[in-house]
Structures are given as C-alpha cells and as structure tokens.
Amino acid sequence: MQEQYNPSEIEALVQKHWHDNKTFEVTEDANKEKFYCLSMFPYPSGRLHMGHVRNYTIGDVVARFQRLQGKNVLQPIGWDSFGLPAENAAINNKTAPAPWTYENIEYMKNQLKLLGFGYDWSREIATCTPEYYRWEQWFFTKLYEKGLVYKKTASVNWCPNDETVLANEQVQDGCCWRCDTPVEQKEIPQWFIKITAYAEELLNDIDTLDGWPDQVKTMQRNWIGRSEGVEMTFGVAGHDKSFDIYTTRPDTLMGVTYVAIAAGHPLAEIAAHTNPELAAFIDECKNSTTSEAELATMEKRGVATGLFAIHPITGKQVPIWAANFVLMNYGTGAVMSVPGHDQRDFEFAKKYGLAIEAVIKPVDGDVDISEAAYTEKGVLFNSGEFDGLDFEAGFNAIANKLVAEGKGKRQVNYRLRDWGVSRQRYWGAPIPMVTLADGTVIPTPADQLPVLLPEDVVMDGIQSPIKADKEWAKTQVNGQDALRETDTFDTFMESSWYYARYCSPHADEMLDPAKANYWLPVDQYIGGIEHACMHLLYFRFFHKLLRDAGLVNSNEPAKQLLTQGMVLADAFYYINEKGARVWVSPLDVATTEKDDKGRITKAIDKDGNELVYTGMSKMSKSKNNGIDPQVMVEKYGADTVRLFMMFASPPELTLEWQESGVEGAHRFIKRLWKLANEHVNQDNSEALDVSTLTSDQKALRREVHKTIAKVTDDIGRRQMFNTAVAAVMELMNHLQKAPQTTGQDNAIIGEALSAIVRLLYPIIPHVSFNLWNELGNASNIEDSQWPVVDEAALVEDSKLIVVQVNGKVRAKITVAADADKESVEALGMIDEHVIKYLDGLTVRKVIYVPGKLLSIVAN
C-alpha cells in the first residue's frame, strides 16, 4: 500500500475499473429486490455547477448504500436537452443549437464521470434525439384520440417589429430583448392537455405521498386549488344579456356593490364601442402581463363600463367596472366585488369612490370597515332574510335559494389550468399535428413519426427556422396535401416521462411494460423544491396518463422525494469608473479581514480593488460566485468534494461553500488513509476472539457497532448524511487513541476499518474501493455487504453513574449494567467523595435514574 494518499491516481484507476467492468449496468432480476434511485437530469448548459454536484452526490450516496443492502439498484442519467438557452447560445456563437448541445453533453458527461457517480450509462438518453421524442409525439396523438388534447387561442408575448413570439425571458422591461420594441399581448391558437380532468385525483393522491416533503405537498395542494362555491348568474340592466361569476363566499352576496370584469370580457368589448376611455383601457390591458404573481403586486386600475349588473337576489343594480386585476382566462372573467369583506375590493372601491357595505360581523361584536375590509367569517346582517346565519348556514341558504330560482348552482372549482404545451420556438420536439387542405386538423399518422426536427439550421434570432422555412411544413397524409404544425412542445413534456423511458431506453415502443413495472415507481427521487408546482406536478400527471394507457401499473411515479437545498458562496463586488458593479469571484479575492465572530469586514481582490462583501448568496453567474467543481476536483479529488457536500449541511438546507471546509474534508481522508496504512503494516494474523477481550477493548468495539447502527439509520432512514459522517469521524478519533500492542487490539481496529470503508463507500467510493482491497478482501467493495451490527457488542457489562448530592455532582461510580437501585445506592453511599459531602447530614431522599444518575437529597 502506498504511503501517501494520491486522489488523482486512485480515482482514475477506480473509475477505469468501473467502466471496464460495467459495474453499474443492471438488468431486471425477479429474484432481487429492486431500488430505483433518480436525480433530476441536467440541462446541458456547458459545465456542471455545485448545485448539480450536490444533487447528484446525494443520489449516488443513496444508490450505493442500497446496493450494499443487496438490492438491484438502477441509477440512470440523461440530458434534458431541448430549450431556449440553446437557441440563444447558437445565435451568440453563430452555430446551430444541435452541435452546441451535443458538445456540451460530451463535456458534462466527462465531468460526471470524474466525480465518480455510479450511473448505468447504457441507459443514457438525450431528449433532443428522435429516438426519444418520437414516443412523446406518439403519446400526444393517443391523448388527442382520447379527447385529452385540444386547441384554443391563448395569449403570448408578441414583438410587432420582428413579428415573432417571445418567451417571458426575452421580454426585458416590457420590451423585446433584441430590438427594444414594446411587447404586445397577442392571442394565437395553441395546444393544451387536459390536466384539469385529473385535478381531483392529483389532489386526493397527495395524501398517499408519505415519502414526500410536507412543503411540496402543501404547495401542490395550493396550486391545484380546489374550492367549493357557487356559480351564479347576473343580468345586465337594459340588455338581453347575462353573465356568470363564481364565488367561494356566497354568504357575502348581499354586500355586492359593484362587479369587476376582465378587459377582454364580451361586455367590456360591447361597452367600449361608445366609451373611448374604456376602449383605450382595454388596449392597454391587452399589452400588460397575465401573470398571477405580477397581478398580485401591480396597481389595481379600472374604468366604469356604463353598464349595470342586476343582483340575482335583491334585483338591485350595481355598476360594472372593467378592471386590470381580473383575468379572462381565469374563472368566468368576472368577479362579484364585496369591498366590505375583501381587501382588494375595498382598496379599489376607496380609489374610485364606490359604495362599501358591511354584511358580515363577528359573532360577539360589531364590525368596523372604515379603514379595512373585515375578511373573517362571521354572522350575516344587513342581509334581509339571511340575517343571523353563520357562515355555513348562510352559504347553504343563499346557495339553495339561487339553485331553486334557477340563478345558480353549487360548483367545485380548481385554480389549476389546462397545460398549454405549444411553444413558438425552434429547439423543441415538433407537435405531431397536421392541417389538411380542407382545414381539418388531425394527428400525424404513427407510420410518419417521428416528425423530425431539422438540426442543420441557421438561427437569425428572429423566427424559428421551421416557421421561416415554408417547405418544411409541407407534407402529405393519406395522399392529401397537408401542413405540419410548426410549434414545438413545452420542454416540461420531455421531463415529465424521462424517468419511465430509462426503464427500457432502447425499446421500439414508448415503454416496455414488463420492464417499466419492474422498476417503477422510482424509489428515491432527488431535486430542488423550486420544481414543486411545475415539473413535479406534470411528472405525477404524466404517470397517471401512462397508467391509463396501460403502460404502467402504479398510481404515482415516485415513493420518496428529497428536495436538496441550494449551494451558497461569498459574493463580492466593487464599483468601476462608470459607477457599475463588477462582481468578483471568491477565487479572485486575495485577502480578507474578519471580526471576532468570523464575519468578513474587509476584502481586497488580486488587482487591488477594495471589495464590498454582500454575504452568502446562491451561486450564480450574475454574481460571479460560482465555484467550478472541476477546479476543486483537480485540487483535492472527487472524494473530498463529495465528502464536503455531504458533511457541511443537512441535505434539505442550504449549504455554505467554504474552502476551509473542503480542506478539512481532505485532511480527514488523509487521516483515514494513514490509519489504514499503519494497520496493514502491522501483524494482523490474529483473528478477533470476543471471549478474550478486555473491558477497554469491549468498549472500543462497542463504539464500532454503535457507529454502524447510527450510520445505517442516518443514511437509510433519516437521510441525514452529515450526522452519518460526523459519527464516523468520532469513531476515527477513538481508533487513533486506541493501543495497537496486542493481536486483539489489531483485530478490533481491522474490524473497525472494514466497517468504516463500507460506511463511507457511498460518500467517498474511490478511496473506499482502494482501502477495501488493501485491507485484504478478495472481492471488490461493490460486491460486499453493508456492515451488520453485532447486538452482543452493544451490551454493556457496566455503567458509569453520576452521583449528585443536593443537586451537585460529587462522584462517578461504575456499577454492573444490570445493578438494581439498592445495589447502586449502596455503592454510592460508600464512595469517599459522597461520604465527605454527607458528613453531618441526614439523607432525606434518594432518586435513581436507571443507568444514568443517583441523586441524594440530605440536610
């Protein structure tokens, strides 16, 4: 065994062994329990960042741990390789998205291999390849045939100068990123999948996700947003028209003082013909955001339409206002406004001088709505026949009256909207629909799939090449001329079913059901909580679609979900001569000064600039505080980077990158190497004989097996990898202090090292692989079993008992592990220190906490 730890040499040899022996390639095996471990696959942006490394290290730790449990472990990897960044990079680099993407995949693939992740590379997929998206297109046509796909107009960002659709990221301060033209909202036809048809099941099945974080489940419940309410009809005074609104608070109906409708509502369009102010407002709203998040914070504005709604119960007329906070594509495009009991309605009413009436008050007092709306549930008043009813009774009474009079119905609504999957981009999977010469729209026949995306294109930064090339759209279906759809799929489509394709990545069908049902559901899924409401919901939805197509048997795609925290790093900047901030990489900071609490108070970069320190923030390009994993691997080795990632923080919390911590992890591995090196150079011929061990040897062995128990629980059940590492470090401290003078001393240290390299194998696999062989094991560590706790070793012959006299520790005594209270009390009373402090006192009370404490009260 070489004396010095040389990570680059060791890691290269071990990785070559894994590659040559296809160590992590797996097939279905009915005789073994399976375990499918999956980290969210990366977008091939060009280089891995530390967020990737944390995600994939966690996944690899779980996968390797389960492998040593004797399970058949699948851990695949692939590339979420369609998307807008490739188009932007292609424009900037004067290339096409395809070669840029494939080059990035190769580079990042090598980075992943250098980090030692145990992937089954034979299952690698890239979503931009026809072999993958062919089956996505096929499945979309099947969903269309089942009535789960439809086309309708929806709003997009439109640049009138370039005459092209812009992604949200391409709108900067309301203008086109390329030509600075003000962006408009334009209605164009788009394809949708009916996720709302599964809303109830998606909501109810959240209760079955026992292995998912509560925070993610709550976010999904809120996103789906089930509500029970009443849909009711208001007439329009002087017109033979009516419109519907939906409310979850029918108990407040008697307090309606105005109605707000979307600028795009048919009534607003009618009123605008004779109302120039309203017409201008409608045009303005057409070009403003439709994002709910932005609407929540923007100024609430409106214009009176001049129309009046007829209250469905009282017959009273209330004004109809067009308002910028009502969305035509959300609900009915109209809301009843009760400013006495809704704060947004209250503020709008105050702004425009509209009436405010109170109709709900607390059970035990009066209500004051002079400064703010009263939004709690309470008792109805000023509500005619409904006075005195509480929320539930008022809800039911008003709902029943509306239903009885044919003016309303009880209804369950969802906040969730159908999934718009059309994107007016190039670098995505073409949507497999065609329009025949007579205008009929049909799916592309299966024998014409895949609809290939041409990869040899020129990006002009304005229009999608497949939209610009009129010839590309021309095709024939059943002998008829037809035009292809030139929109491409939302890239969430690819990431919604990739996990299932890994089960049979080379199958000449979407999924091989036998293989899919062997591996699925995923046993452990790992990714960021930022995906809670988009990817993770589509992921669940797609699984149910696959189930209903007969391709999988399970109801949910993943049993357990771990959402890892972000990786943070120090962020520094200086102000340049133009007054702009220039962010400086932490690696380029030459000197820092810290206060007595370790906080940075001054920093200078390598060019002598005095820096402003802004604290720890998420590693990002914008703040130039990302740390290149490759630089760290070259400096310290992959095992050190992995160990730091697992030790520095619990997995769900943010991790603060500190190179001093990386150095500490490196020192620990060198300590382990040194201890193993010293041990293999000893005479280790004597086998362990537990019957001959001294009490000190038994105590050391007890620490070994306590550590095995703790690490097993920390990794396997609690997923607290940081405390698992801490437990091994503590055991190492015991071993380094232990004597190595007898054969049994060496035998115990040998047993301990055998356990340690397996306990650490999931985290630092290269050094563990090497040390396992150096310790004299015939087979490789991947073929070994996880260490098993010797329960007998945990049994203590004796206990150390703390003795207190009147609340102060006066002695510590050793007693037999099974000693009863009387025996412990007798031993305590004859201890010389206890006798000293009881001199002249009378014992009044003795309390014994078994195995821990003897407390004597005397006066």
UniProtKB/Swiss-Prot annotation:
<keyword id="KW-0547">Nucleotide-binding</keyword>
<dbReference type="InterPro" id="IPR014729">
    <property type="entry name" value="Rossmann-like_a/b/a_fold"/>
</dbReference>
<keyword id="KW-0030">Aminoacyl-tRNA synthetase</keyword>
<dbReference type="GO" id="GO:0005829">
    <property type="term" value="C:cytosol"/>
</dbReference>
<comment type="similarity">
    <text>Belongs to the class-I aminoacyl-tRNA synthetase family.</text>
</comment>
<dbReference type="InterPro" id="IPR013155">
    <property type="entry name" value="M/V/L/I-tRNA-synth_anticd-bd"/>
</dbReference>
<dbReference type="InterPro" id="IPR002300">
    <property type="entry name" value="aa-tRNA-synth_Ia"/>
</dbReference>
<dbReference type="Pfam" id="PF13603">
    <property type="entry name" value="tRNA-synt_1_2"/>
</dbReference>
<feature type="short sequence motif" description="'KMSKS' region">
    <location>
        <begin position="618"/>
        <end position="622"/>
    </location>
</feature>
<dbReference type="GO" id="GO:0004823">
    <property type="term" value="F:leucine-tRNA ligase activity"/>
</dbReference>
<dbReference type="InterPro" id="IPR009080">
    <property type="entry name" value="tRNAsynth_Ia_anticodon-bd"/>
</dbReference>
<dbReference type="GO" id="GO:0005524">
    <property type="term" value="F:ATP binding"/>
</dbReference>
<dbReference type="InterPro" id="IPR015413">
    <property type="entry name" value="Methionyl/Leucyl_tRNA_Synth"/>
</dbReference>
<dbReference type="Pfam" id="PF00133">
    <property type="entry name" value="tRNA-synt_1"/>
</dbReference>
<dbReference type="Pfam" id="PF08264">
    <property type="entry name" value="Anticodon_1"/>
</dbReference>
<keyword id="KW-0436">Ligase</keyword>
<dbReference type="InterPro" id="IPR001412">
    <property type="entry name" value="aa-tRNA-synth_I_CS"/>
</dbReference>
<protein>
    <recommendedName>
        <fullName>Leucine--tRNA ligase</fullName>
        <ecNumber>6.1.1.4</ecNumber>
    </recommendedName>
</protein>
<feature type="short sequence motif" description="'HIGH' region">
    <location>
        <begin position="42"/>
        <end position="52"/>
    </location>
</feature>
<keyword id="KW-0963">Cytoplasm</keyword>
<keyword id="KW-0067">ATP-binding</keyword>
<feature type="binding site">
    <location>
        <position position="621"/>
    </location>
    <ligand>
        <name>ATP</name>
    </ligand>
</feature>
<dbReference type="GO" id="GO:0006429">
    <property type="term" value="P:leucyl-tRNA aminoacylation"/>
</dbReference>
<dbReference type="InterPro" id="IPR025709">
    <property type="entry name" value="Leu_tRNA-synth_edit"/>
</dbReference>
<dbReference type="Pfam" id="PF09334">
    <property type="entry name" value="tRNA-synt_1g"/>
</dbReference>
<keyword id="KW-0648">Protein biosynthesis</keyword>
<dbReference type="InterPro" id="IPR002302">
    <property type="entry name" value="Leu-tRNA-ligase"/>
</dbReference>
<dbReference type="GO" id="GO:0002161">
    <property type="term" value="F:aminoacyl-tRNA deacylase activity"/>
</dbReference>
<dbReference type="InterPro" id="IPR009008">
    <property type="entry name" value="Val/Leu/Ile-tRNA-synth_edit"/>
</dbReference>
